[in-house]
């Protein structure tokens, strides 16, 4: 009897497949992506590599040593303190505790602060609270801390917003009115996002993470791109990450353009240059998971799309890999066997510069991804490499070389806890364990500024406050 291997379906259910079936599923998945995106399918060697990863006997797998990448985040601390019946585990804790738990306990390379409603529009009435939380977090933390939220243009339509729902207008054959409603909503999205981030950046935020860009279609992406453009013009040093909602931009409007390019129907490799043109530092491409297909099919398809996006992108790519995207099953508690295999494949085959950790419980998302492919933050040098990707738009290889040279170590040492533990204490750039007298928070980040020859926003704020 042929040997069968334990894989997953797109909904997380376990399924057993032979090697021949796995190879067949990989071929079908990459062919689907190649056909839709008009991009190259995976080569025979790449498909063999993917099959090898999927058939590895261990419950968890990880990237080869030296191939680790930094991670960014969606949903912030909501995966810890959230309790809405989704992936939040309902631990009563402050957002400061949540952020520092990711930094000190999970080994995160970066982190983000976010509102419980996690959209920019609801932040407006409570922006002062968000600014206070950001200031307190920045005073205590060392790794880059973003403010994260969804553009979520749907909130600008009735009954939640001021503009008539374009779906209702289209059903009434009021096409022109539907277009105008989307255009007005996009303008308000841009305005609100810029206003919120002006406040947060003035409170020390390292930058902004636009999560699920394009969720409401091409108007949503249009408004977000213009927000990125405005923020980059006003704040040249702001870290900006733009993560997508789906693999293909839905043409709800159909005629909206950015930089002369029609947004409707763009695939990840076509989205990347526009996001870079707008002024983002990091692009978060997406490939949606099909819950009725196997993990072999889904992962092959996702890796194919992401490989093309990485090659086309002028800026680093942090592939979105929460539940339901990036080859990850659509399950609130993502199976760690599937998560770690997807994580490894994205790094070793697609060549991503990082991973944006999305929705999922703490063990199934940040812990699994960081164990599989992360640089482990302050335990090593992950936060330093992440800062170079965002402050100078460096791809992963260049960022590692730069940081290694500044530290006077080999690139392999950047993820060596033994080397970095002593070196971080010697340089006083923040250490993960509590040592009395060692630089923490702002003090550690000021030393990082000198080491890497960069400016950090929270340090600039502190200098203004004591001037």
From Swiss-Prot:
Q: List the disulfide bonds.
A: none
GO terms (BP aspect): methane biosynthetic process from dimethylamine; methylation
Which positions are tagged coiled coil? none
UniProt-recorded Gene Ontology molecular function terms: dimethylamine methyltransferase activity
Q: Is Methyltransferase found in the keyword set?
A: yes
Its top-level enzyme class, in one word, is transferase
Q: From the UniProt record, give the pathway where this protein acts.
A: One-carbon metabolism; methanogenesis from dimethylamine
Which family does this protein fall into?
Belongs to the dimethylamine methyltransferase family.
Give the protein's function.
Catalyzes the transfer of a methyl group from dimethylamine to the corrinoid cofactor of MtbC. The major or perhaps only DMA methyltransferase expressed under inducing conditions.
Entry protein name = Dimethylamine methyltransferase MtbB1
